[in-house]
């Protein structure tokens, strides 16, 4: 479900300060953030953002197609390692 237009986009103030500084100085370093709920704005296009997945910061390069989505949509928080394999038993009749 999308957010109400009346409320505006969900933005983290600390992240937006870091983005403004990075875009003004053409900084190419990764901006670390824990705000997975924050919406990607056009100001972030071309920046590298490290989004926390619960264990580490996953680097993401922001493109124009990502504008309007949340940062957390581009990192997975769960790793599927596969189901346990059943042992093969020879059937002799």
Swiss-Prot record:
Pfam families: Ribosomal_S19. GO terms for biological process: ribosomal small subunit assembly; translation. Keywords: Ribonucleoprotein, Ribosomal protein, RNA-binding, rRNA-binding. Transmembrane segments: none annotated. SUPFAM superfamilies: Ribosomal protein S19. Disulfide bonds: none annotated. The keyword Ribosomal protein applies. InterPro entries: Ribosomal_uS19, Ribosomal_uS19_bac-type, Ribosomal_uS19_CS, Ribosomal_uS19_SF. GO terms for molecular function: rRNA binding; structural constituent of ribosome. It comes from the Bacteria. One of its GO terms (cellular component) is small ribosomal subunit. Belongs to the universal ribosomal protein uS19 family. Protein S19 forms a complex with S13 that binds strongly to the 16S ribosomal RNA. PANTHER family: RIBOSOMAL PROTEIN S19P FAMILY MEMBER (PTHR11880), SMALL RIBOSOMAL SUBUNIT PROTEIN US19M (PTHR11880:SF8). This is Small ribosomal subunit protein uS19. It comes from Dehalococcoides mccartyi (strain ATCC BAA-2266 / KCTC 15142 / 195).
């Amino acid at each position: 479900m999308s957010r109400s237009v009346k409320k505006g986009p969900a933005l983290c103030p600390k992240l937006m300060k870091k983005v403004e500084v990075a875009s003004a100085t053409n900084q190419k370093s990764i901006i670390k953030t824990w705000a997975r709920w924050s919406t990607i704005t056009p100001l972030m296009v071309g920046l590298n953002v490290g989004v926390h997945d619960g264990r580490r910061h996953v680097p993401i390069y922001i493109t124009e197609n990502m504008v309007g989505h949340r940062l957390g949509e581009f990192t997975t928080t769960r790793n599927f390692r596969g189901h346990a394999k059943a042992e093969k038993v020879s059937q002799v009749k």
